[in-house]
């Protein structure tokens, strides 16, 4: 609630939990039901990314849903950034928190997000 209302007491400051949750909702209730090919592409991209050592010690490493949610947050410039110097061994995030950084770091995930959401200029307000 604090995150959605842009409260100063938001424990998720720097990221948008609505975008994150919406990403999972789209996957489970739209892509899985109507566009299984895209959902399968997420699974393949996740497996390749993890095999390549991407997303180490982040939420995106946990499973393909977390991977998708973290990617969508970054696609909408709505993810928290933890630089390598700031990150602990089990950090939730890394330095990827914008659309451009996602395109460079994980082009496969960026391409899937772009195919689902298009090149929209929309970004969350807080």
Question: Which positions does each model-derived feature cover?
Answer:
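Short, conserved helix/loop micro-motifs enriched in His/Cys and acidic residues
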Residues: 1-5, 45-54, 89-93
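Acidic/His-rich structured neighborhood in mature extracellular/periplasmic domains
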Residues: 1-43
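Soluble non-cytosolic domains of exported or imported proteins
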Residues: 9-17, 59-63, 100-107
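Arginine residue identity/basic-tract feature
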Residues: 11, 20, 27-28, 44, ...
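Post-HExxH zinc-binding segment in Zn-dependent metallohydrolases
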Residues: 29-81
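Pan-zinc metallopeptidase signature
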Residues: 72-126
């Amino acid at each position: 609630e604090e995150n959605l209302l842009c409260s100063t007491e938001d424990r998720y400051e720097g990221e948008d939990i609505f975008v994150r949750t919406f990403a999972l909702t789209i996957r489970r209730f739209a892509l899985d039901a109507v566009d299984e090919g895209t959902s399968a592409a997420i699974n393949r991209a996740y497996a390749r990314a993890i095999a390549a050592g991407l997303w180490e010690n982040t939420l995106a490493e946990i499973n393909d849903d977390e991977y998708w949610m973290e990617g969508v947050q970054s696609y909408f410039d709505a993810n928290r950034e933890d630089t390598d110097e700031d990150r602990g061994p089990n950090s939730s995030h890394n330095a990827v928190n914008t659309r451009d950084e996602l395109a460079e770091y994980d082009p496969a995930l960026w391409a899937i997000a772009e195919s689902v959401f298009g090149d929209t200029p929309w970004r969350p307000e807080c």
